[in-house]
Amino acid sequence: QRSTLFPYTTLFRSRDRHGALANLRLRLDAVYAGRPRAIVADRALAYVVHHCGIPRLLLEALLDGFAWDAEGRQYETIEDLHGYAARVAGTVGAMMSLVMDTRGAAPLARACELGVAMQLTNIARDVGEDARAGRLYLPLAWLREAGIDPAAWLAAPVFGPGIAAVVQRLLAEADRLYVRAEQGVAALPRDCRPAILGARLVYAEIGREIEASGLDSVNRRAVVSDRRKLALMARASTAWLRVGVDAQARAPALPAVRFLVDAAAMPAPEPRRGFYARTVHILELLETVEQRRRTQTVHVNSH
């Protein structure tokens, strides 16, 4: 049983998707009004957003990303794809940072960029799965540059050198953002650093698995073995001690995440303790939100 940012959502047919999203927004209204519905998850969310000072814009942006999925939106450029990834994953990075009492603009930027990098990895991994469901997230301009007509390919998705080149390019962009994001680890509370660094290492390793399969994510779905995950988490448990701070730690935010950073960089509430367990809990969100999103259905339990 996995946790989720919206544990009160389950899944149902796409014809109800827009109504479900509208209902989620109403529930968000109630949460921020301090009158959550009589649902455990709503009450828990109300506690977190008020106790941790989480701006509503972050959750609204996440729902916007779900709405873009409901529309079947495609992305012309990598910058457009950054905008999507900022909403469905950068928002989670920002909220994690706030839960861990890290509210400076620079570390928030790195947290959002980590979310974007993870989402790009998800997209590179799931090219075939998405295509068979009628979804295409690879930048359309990159496909054309590789000699691929996006509409024709989506109608009959096959692996070839052009797709391999686009997947490699997307992984390179994810890796660039992983390197930037790692610089934000040093700004986190010490007991949170191993978990965040471990998540960064495990997600980046998905890219290495894709490369090991010849970049064929049309016919195969790359998986990091449990043994390898444990090794990477063990590495993270000590590697965080060696994470330094360089110029990238203070680099300007990726343009697509600036609105998130601007919303989240605010005075901190009263200090809190005991964040490690909560951090590990929240680390599951990116993968869970991605899995929920890919079903293309959202169900709201309003009872």
What is each of the regions a protein language model found here?
Residues 1-10:
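Single conserved hydrophobic/aromatic residue that forms the stacking wall/gate
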Residues 12-117, 124, 129-303:
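Catalytic cores of Mg2+-dependent Asp-rich isoprenoid enzymes
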